[in-house]
């Protein structure tokens, strides 16, 4: 499993710069910083959960992947190339990538996964590098569900011993967008 070097920030200076500074317990990609020679300062006080991680260049090659494995061992995947907005996936495209697919399948087997996880990675020279695994339903769960990857439903069906509903992967190239709405409450006039 290719992955970027990662170390606790409290263990000393990062192995190399540039690198990423983030919390192990973050939410989305909020409070993620790229440290460079100019922005890294020795003696900075870090928190217990802060980590340094190898920076993998190429925001245009960032993916978020849904990975589901049933109790019977059936593996289902969805690969989404994404662009971040405000620390969360703002838009993206359904992709097919044999190297990523092989990595996800291997990961599901090695972890003896039952249920769903979210795997985030970047490609470097065509090789997928996993930089984060979220053992939960991620912020892309609604996108995935609308595209037919119903891992929440499958997880519930599987946990009570029902057969899981069929999955027809969406075609490569479908685009998705997160849209925020402005709402005006004309009934509430006293603030």
What are these regions (language model features)?
Residues 1-33:
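A conserved helix-loop-beta module that forms one wall/lid of the active-site cleft
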Residues 13-15, 27, 47, 60, ...:
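A generic fold-level signal
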Residues 16-18, 62-64, 116-118:
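Broad gene-expression machinery/nucleic-acid interaction feature
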Residues 26-27, 84-88, 136-139:
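A short, flexible beta-alpha/helix-coil linker loop
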Residues 29, 73, 139-141:
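Residue-level signal for secondary-structure boundary sites
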Residues 32-112, 122-123, 127-129:
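Phosphate-binding site of ATP-dependent enzymes
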Residues 95-191:
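ATP-dependent carboxylate activation and anion-phosphoryl transfer catalytic cores
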């Amino acid at each position: 499993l290719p992955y970027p070097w990662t170390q606790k920030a409290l263990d000393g200076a990062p192995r190399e710069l540039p690198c990423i500074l983030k919390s192990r317990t973050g939410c989305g990609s909020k409070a993620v910083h790229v440290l460079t020679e100019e922005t890294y300062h020795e003696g900075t006080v870090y928190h217990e959960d802060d980590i340094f991680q190898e920076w993998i260049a190429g925001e245009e090659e960032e993916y978020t992947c849904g990975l589901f494995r049933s109790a019977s061992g059936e593996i289902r995947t969805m690969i989404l190339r994404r662009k971040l907005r405000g620390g969360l996936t703002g838009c993206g495209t359904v992709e097919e990538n044999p190297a990523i697919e092989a990595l996800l399948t291997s990961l599901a087997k090695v972890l003896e996964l039952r249920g769903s996880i979210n795997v985030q990675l970047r490609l470097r020279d065509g090789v997928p590098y996993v930089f984060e695994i979220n053992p939960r339903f991620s912020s892309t769960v609604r996108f995935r569900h609308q595209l037919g990857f119903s891992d929440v439903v499958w997880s519930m069906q599987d946990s009570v011993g029902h057969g899981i509903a069929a999955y027809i992967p969406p075609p490569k190239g479908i685009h998705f967008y997160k849209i925020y709405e402005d709402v005006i409450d004309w009934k509430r006039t006293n603030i």
